[in-house]
Amino acid sequence: MLRSIPRRVPRRLPIFTTTATAGGPSRLAQRAFTCGYLRMSPSSLPPVQPPVSSTLPSDSYQLLSTADKAGDAEDALYEQQIKDVEAWWNSPRFEGIKRPYSAADVVSKRGSLQQTYPSSLMARKLFNLLNERAAENKPVHTMGAIDPVQMTQQAPNQEVLYVSGWACSSVLTTTNEVSPDFGDYPYNTVPNQVQRLFKAQQLHDRKHWDARRKMTPEQRKSTPYIDYMRPIIADGDTGHGGLTAVLKLAKLFAENGAAAVHFEDQMHGGKKCGHLAGKVLVPIGEHINRLVATRFQWDMMGVENLVIARTDSESGKLLSSAIDVRDHEFILGVTEESEPLAETLQAMEREGAAPSEIDAFELDWVKRHKLVTFDEAVDAHLEAEGAPQAARDAYKKRVKENPDLSITRRRELANDYTKTPVVWSCDIPRTREGFYHYRAGFPAATKRAKEFGPYADLLWVETGDPNVEKAAKLAGEVRAALPGKKLVYNLSPSFNWMGQGFDEASLKSFIWDLAQHGFVLQLISLAGLHSGATITAELSRAFKDEGMLAYVRLIQAREKELGVDVLTHQKWSGAPYMDGIVGAIQSGSSSSKSMGEGNTEKGEFNPLVF
């Protein structure tokens, strides 16, 4: 964004110095202080366009006296920020992004103090990377990390870092109460993990930078640079509540270092891992509101962080509400009149039926009553009435032309072709919680992706199996409506990859095959969790019988062979770096340096021989 402010805002602030005289303090001098752009020496590095970090108009405003803030100055700041925001929104960064609010809506809610956030720079870095890979039909593929160790080992190889809500729920919550991925952990859990990893990235970046300054220019040129500042992509689950909760969560993510966050269209309180049963979806409009709330919060903060919209409708079979007509074509009902299922179950409970009896009755009821969409009910009704195929096809053609017709309008349309009213109810089979049954599958997922697309930077459809052909069909339909839209694919460890019919060649090319269809961001969400479990299990079993031989064979020798920097874990953790800082502050005391004499890492790790 352009960072300037009209001239009518005072730019020169009087700062007075005083001295005591017989008559009291007197004004001796007046020094002008100018609030403007940061003055930097000319740089050989290319400028960032548009700038991400620069002096903000609000900086000038904050340094005015209180008396000067009222009136013209505040109006000038407000008007300038509106112009800046509008120019920002018209930049290539937000091409194709829809906002149902105005720049004035955002600026009026910002307050007079603006800040800059490092996560916005990381977001620009991610945006540029995704654009570069998308232009080449190549992937940005990464793995979930659960701690700073995994982050540092991925940094030389993966270009982005992923933080999974599943992993946080099962490994590290802010209450230390670990559990399955039901989205019921405190909402600051994943942002805290993001902050932990973001701070670790900065430590290892500083450590690496310091180590390179000790090299000669020739050594620096020949030594590969490790970029520890990889953009972090994080799991926002359902947003953890209503829209105000989404706002606060989005703010926390941006403050803590996340470059991008994904939000899924499941119901808060009914959320399940995307590969579990029992998922409850929210109406299309409700999830769009979450995406808009996230964008609004980040617009208020002036950050470019990326919004990722995820849908679980390929397998989610329940819907929290039927209020959105865009969902109506996929809502299921029954074609015979009967007592509502929920009322029957409540009556059984009041009469003392055992939970197992109630569960068995509900399961049997659903099997006995075929669940169909209203359009399927109309077609069956026309067939039963002996209507000609032309009438059946005509109805199908009309609803295909306008798939967002409500159930009410569909009934009116059906009456044009039927002799008697269609019997169909989506309320009779509602669950005990009041949820509607929903026709999950790729048609529903495709529609939702298209609806979410204008409000999101990337789209993620959670799928039930790894299949390039299915993914390609989905991508083709979505990108026909949203040209160039970038897609996300979860290379989930929940899939039995060995049982999917892959040979080595197709398994190896899977990621790159997907990238040809627009799946530019791909991730193994729980790779860190599984890799840690695997090596720990192997070491634990061997250590039981082999003792230190197992540790040296499985860990130290492998660290040496692979060049893993954690082999010298004191150095990895930054001990020499901190010694350097302390040494710059205070001379002498070399005997108290952590990496001095007595440090067992010093000279200990020569090649290990067996």
From Swiss-Prot:
Transmembrane segments: none
Main location group: mitochondrion
UniProt transit peptide range: 1-40
Entry GO terms, CC: mitochondrial matrix
Reactions catalysed, as given in the entry: (2S,3R)-3-hydroxybutane-1,2,3-tricarboxylate = pyruvate + succinate
Disulfide bond positions: none
Pathway(s) where this gene product acts: Organic acid metabolism; propanoate degradation
Active site: C273
MF terms in GO: isocitrate lyase activity; methylisocitrate lyase activity
The organism's place on the tree of life at top rank: Eukaryota
One Pfam short name: ICL
Localisation: Mitochondrion matrix
Disruption phenotype: Impairs growth with propionate as the sole carbon and energy source.
Top enzyme category: lyase
Assigned EC number: 4.1.3.30
Cofactors demanded by this protein: Mg(2+)
UniProt xrefs under CDD domains: ICL_PEPM (cd00377)
InterPro entries per the UniProt record, alphabetical: ICL/PEPM, Isocitrate_lyase, Isocitrate_lyase_ph_CS, Pyrv/PenolPyrv_kinase-like_dom, Pyrv_kinase-like_dom_sf
Region (Disordered), start-end ranges: 588-610
Keywords of the record: Lyase, Mitochondrion, Transit peptide
PROSITE patterns: ISOCITRATE_LYASE
GO BP of this protein: propionate catabolic process, 2-methylcitrate cycle
Known role: Catalyzes the formation of pyruvate and succinate from 2-methylisocitrate during the metabolism of endogenous propionyl-CoA.
Family listed: Belongs to the isocitrate lyase/PEP mutase superfamily. Isocitrate lyase family.
This protein's name: Methylisocitrate lyase, mitochondrial
Gene: mclA
